[in-house]
Each structure stands twice: as structure tokens, then as C-alpha cells.
């Protein structure tokens, strides 16, 4: 199974934009509190982003203090992490993805 990037969703406003319509520079803070953050960071890099990695433990409970020093660039996180965050500034986004079943798995 692979994951296909679908769109960007603003965490504060819930505004959704197409994956190719990113409105900012392509250097971002990437925040991940998941078990394998490398895949998330690789996905962003494959979309042409320069990534400043911020790794948190899996199932981390974020607070606004965790983001105090992330004001200079847009912040992208996983949908799983975004759901756990309080209202954040408008420069916080998450990457919406869709699972793609590989051809071999479909036939099983």
C-alpha cells in the first residue's frame, strides 16, 4: 500500500487547496508525532519541499508551546497530528493523503 498526497488543509480555517497550488515558498517546518516520520518527510521532499524536521514521540499531545519557535516558515504536519492540535495560526497546514492499494494487493 502506498499513500498519495491529495491536498493541503489549513488547520485553522479548514481551507483546502490542491496539492500543486501551495501558496508559499517550498521551505517548511515539518512536524510529525508518528511512529515512522521518515515517510512523511520523504513525501514532502518528493513534492519539492525543503524540510526542516521536527520529530515528536508517537501519539504526542501537542501544546501551543511546541510551536513557539516555528513562526518563520509555514508548518506542515500529518492529519493524525493536526487533529490533536488546538487552534493554530494560519500558517499551519496538514497534508491530506489517500491510501492507494498496489496492484498485487487488489487481487488477493
What is each stretch, according to the model?
Residues 43, 87, 105-106:
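Short conserved micro-motifs at the rims of enzyme active sites and ligand-binding pockets
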Residues 4-8, 57-61, 91-108:
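Short, flexible loop segments at boundaries between secondary-structure elements
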Residues 82-83, 101:
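Short acidic, S/G/P-rich loop/turn micro-motifs used as interaction or catalytic elements
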Residues 78-80:
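Short secondary-structure boundary segments
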Residues 1-76:
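C-terminal accessory "lid"/substrate-recognition subdomains
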Residues 83-91:
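Short loop/helix-cap segments at secondary-structure boundaries that form the rim of catalytic
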Amino acid at each position: 500500500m502506498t499513500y498519495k498526497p491529495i491536498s493541503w488543509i489549513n488547520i485553522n480555517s479548514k481551507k483546502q487547496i490542491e496539492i500543486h497550488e501551495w501558496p508559499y515558498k517550498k521551505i517548511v517546518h515539518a512536524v510529525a508525532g508518528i511512529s515512522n516520520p521518515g515517510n512523511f518527510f520523504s513525501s514532502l521532499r518528493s513534492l519539492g519541499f525543503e524540510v526542516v524536521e521536527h520529530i515528536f514521540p508517537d501519539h504526542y499531545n501537542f501544546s501551543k508551546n511546541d510551536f513557539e519557535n516555528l513562526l518563520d516558515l509555514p508548518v506542515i504536519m500529518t492529519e493524525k497530528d493536526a487533529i490533536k492540535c488546538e487552534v493554530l495560526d494560519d500558517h499551519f497546514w496538514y497534508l491530506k493523503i489517500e491510501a492507494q492499494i498496489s496492484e498485487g494487493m487488489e487481487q488477493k
